[in-house]
Amino acid sequence: MRRHAGKYYCFYSGANFLTDRYGVDFCVADQVLGPYSEAGGGSGARVLHSVPGHVRGPGHHSHALGPDGRTDYLVYHAWNAAMTERQLCLDPLAWTPAGPRADRGPSYSPRPVPGQ
């Protein structure tokens, strides 16, 4: 759960992690107890999703505030393309008019450490 710009966002990971549909989605409400919008509307994960050939099953995420005290990040794990290991990933969270999105995510290549 995350409050942003006066609204409450409930984030969750969903679908079968072995499929390209698995990822992080959200529903939103004006009050913490709801009612909440229909999540995804059947369109699949909107915040973060698999990238065939690079990363599968991104999810099980947390939110963190960056060292600048302003930038939101998603911290999550994902399978590598060969499905031999799960990797820890970190991507900026962008607040767009269409809702939150993993900015430049999911990670599947080295990225600079936040604040450096």
Language-model segments: residues:
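Carbohydrate-active catalytic/glycan-binding domains of CAZyme proteins
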Residues: 1-116
